[in-house]
Amino acid sequence: MSFFGFGPAAELDIALTDGESRRRVEHKTEDGKKEKYFLFYDGETVSGRVTVNLRNPGKRLEHQGLKIEFIGQIELYYDRGNHHEFVSLVKDLARPGEISQSQSFDFEFTHVEKPYESYTGQNVKLRYFLRATLSRRLNDVVKEMDIVVHTLSTYPELNSSIKMEVGIEDCLHIEFEYNKSKYHLKDVIVGKIYFLLVRIKIKHMEIDIIKRETTGTGPNVYHENDTIAKYEIMDGAPVRGESIPIRLFLAGYELTPTMRDINKKFSVRYYLNLVLIDEEERRYFKQQEVVLWRKGDIVRKSMSHQAAIASQRFEGTSHPETRPQHSGAAAVEQEQE
């Protein structure tokens, strides 16, 4: 019996209708490991079958009903007692009664809205899952199955380059340029750095990709910065007039799309952090936000061709007379020790 802690009298199993053919993707779990889950997109139907397997076939099992739920949920780790549901659908599969043998029940959630990307971060988790519940007088029998949702975007209509002149008065003036301000997750960041004035001895220069996760609202806001990548641009002293190319492939890093004010609970933003280190180990940096987005597998050739042309323009050598003009210079910030 299931009485007095001998285990449930039945077990539930959830199987998707297209489980044999549906793609699986790796997704990070809360403990940092990666597991594979079925992949869904916004608007797709979620259908399958719930099977009630009796531990003692032939013995009648009384229940108060069987239901299946599709849930989209945000959990803030500092507020684990509260789960914020932004999608909640339910279907009753069986009325209260008795089951004397294992039995299966079909379900279908049609064209389900899945507005946000699945995400597991430092302080927050956004998950989608199916939950089957066989209600009983003492202990319900529950089975959950997580899925992963990816949000796809179209090519941005406006994707201007980033151009900025930064410096420290009478000591250092540099000009940096990135070919775009919005990159898809498999994109290549192409750019260049041009030294206009060098009067301090720079020994090292790099670009970092920083992910900034912001959770909470009002006085209860938490920020987590995570350096995803470090890309060495230069090891040695630059000279005036020198131009250094940048070519950073994003495909090798664990990135997500930019997420802004998701359900008014959290945001995930990405920054390119230009870091210079002088011979006295002082660090100077300048951050620039970029937008990351996920594109589908099918790429329009015309847009790919335009992207290739844009890339080629930034791979060439820069000359003072052809450099873009700027309306002003921004200050490079010195990092606090």
Swiss-Prot record:
Membrane topology label: Peripheral membrane protein
Keywords from the UniProt entry: Cytoplasm, Endosome, Membrane, Protein transport, Transport
UniProt GO cellular component terms: endosome; membrane
Region of interest called Disordered, as start-end residue ranges on this chain: 311-337
Protein's name in the database: Vacuolar protein sorting-associated protein 26B
Description of how the protein assembles with itself and partners: Component of the heterotrimeric retromer cargo-selective complex (CSC) which is believed to associate with variable sorting nexins to form functionally distinct retromer complex variants.
GO annotation terms (biological process): intracellular protein transport
Function noted in UniProt: Acts as a component of the retromer cargo-selective complex (CSC). The CSC is believed to be the core functional component of retromer or respective retromer complex variants acting to prevent missorting of selected transmembrane cargo proteins into the lysosomal degradation pathway. Retromer mediates retrograde transport of cargo proteins from endosomes to the trans-Golgi network (TGN).
GN (gene name): vps26b
Family per record: Belongs to the VPS26 family.
Signal peptide: none
Cell compartments where the protein resides: Cytoplasm; Membrane; Endosome
InterPro entries: Arrestin-like_C, Vps26-related
Keyword Protein transport set for record: yes
Keyword set includes Transferase: no
Pfam family, one: Vps26
